[in-house]
From Swiss-Prot:
Keywords: Cell membrane, Cobalt, Cobalt transport, Ion transport, Membrane, Nickel, Nickel transport, Transmembrane, Transmembrane helix, Transport. The keyword Cell membrane applies. NCBIfam families: nico (TIGR00802). One of its GO terms (cellular component) is plasma membrane. This is Cobalt transport protein NhlF. It comes from the Bacteria. One of its GO terms (molecular function) is nickel cation transmembrane transporter activity. The keyword Membrane applies. It is a multi-pass membrane protein. Its main location: membrane. The lineage of its organism: Bacteria, Bacillati, Actinomycetota, Actinomycetes, Mycobacteriales.
Length: 352
């Protein structure tokens, strides 16, 4: 049976030549996205009026992509997969990148469809499609997040039990490996089969693709609106209009990749010592439970607010329109947790 034990030297040591090549490929692909997005705009710079309007929309599309990278669901998916791959003794390089690429595929394809059909579809028809997609995505999100929070609550309880054993002087190294390997929805449901499925960073592409089908966030809806507006103007070709979703993808992939690399570094550092690893995972698992329940609760309020008897929940449900800000808070919390643990680790020997 394949062991899930991590080799600290491999995970915490210098990057191998293969890992550096993979990282260079990821960075190169992100650069190409930026170049394509800008080049499609520059190709129409001969028309000052049209190019000027597209430039403003392009900057906004890029910023929307950056905002979307900090969505709470992005951070949760990337964090969980990064941890899983490290448990398998592999240092992931492109988890965030391939997740963003899967997500971006949906955005680019739908933006193309919107651009091609902008003149044929009415505003009412577009709003109807958006409403149905948003409802389905919300139900899926509530179900997924509730299950994740429930499973992680069990793991958190087990980790707290291990912490009490440590304080009592017990050796928990083997138990810690077992408890941490239970984390994550698919790991708990599929067991070792999930570990066989997630072998490389590129396996996050279909995950990002599926999670992008809802297109329920304000960033994506705004991008599609920009695309439709540019297409209906009649002054730009489809190729030029596609610069908007490409710039959106460039911004999102840049920061999703940065997030996965940071979490790889943070978890690699924590895995070098069992006690450090236990404390770090208690903090991050607890945060996952709280965030999952909070987001699911907001989505439930948003659904119920459509019913007359629950109209008072509308202000709470409206929070779902600003989940990017929650993503910023989650990212900041993980950074502060890692920084605090790092400082504590440096100060601890001095106290002893």
């Amino acid at each position: 049976m394949t062991s899930t034990t991590i080799t600290p030297h491999h995970i915490g040591g210098a990057w191998t030549r293969t890992e550096r090549r993979r990282l260079a490929s990821v960075v190169g692909a992100i650069v190409i996205l930026h170049v394509l997005g800008v080049a499609l705009y520059l190709g129409y710079s001969g028309n000052p009026a049209a190019a000027g309007g597209l430039a403003g929309s392009g900057v906004l599309a890029y910023v929307l992509g950056v905002r979307h990278a900090f969505d709470a669901d992005h951070i949760a998916a990337i964090d969980d997969t990064t941890r899983l791959m490290l448990l398998r003794g592999r240092r992931p390089v492109g988890v965030g990148f391939f997740f963003a690429m899967g997500h971006s595929t949906v955005v680019v394809v739908l933006a193309l469809v919107v651009a091609l059909g902008a003149s044929a579809l009415t505003t009412t028809e577009l709003e109807g499609v958006q409403e149905i997609g948003g409802l389905v995505a919300t139900v899926v999100a509530v179900t997924f997040l509730s299950i994740v929070a429930g499973l992680n609550s069990v793991v958190l309880r087990n980790l707290l039990c291990l912490s009490r054993q440590v304080r009592a002087g017990s050796d928990i190294t083997g138990d810690l490996e077992s408890r941490l390997s239970e984390r994550g929805l698919f790991t708990r449901l599929l067991g070792n089969r999930w570990r066989g499925l997630v072998r490389s960073s590129w396996h996050m592409y279909p995950v990002g693709l599926l999670m992008g089908l809802g297109l329920e966030t304000a960033s994506e809806v705004t991008l599609l609106t920009l695309t439709a507006s540019a297409a209906t103007g009649g002054t730009l070709s489809i190729a030029a209009v596609l610069s908007l979703p490409l710039l959106f993808a460039a911004g999102m992939s840049t920061f999703d990749t940065a997030d996965s690399l940071f979490m790889t570094r943070a978890y690699s550092w924590s895995y070098q010592d069992p006690q450090r690893r236990l404390n770090f995972n208690i903090a991050t698992t607890g945060a996952t439970v709280v965030i999952g329940l909070f987001v699911a609760g907001i989505y439930v309020c948003a659904l119920l607010a459509h019913l007359p008897m629950f109209a008072a929940l509308s202000p709470i449900g409206d929070i779902s329109e600003n989940f990017e800000f929650l993503g910023y808070a989650v990212a900041a919390a993980f950074i502060l947790t890692w920084t605090g643990a790092l400082l504590f680790n440096h100060l601890k020997p001095q106290r002893n």
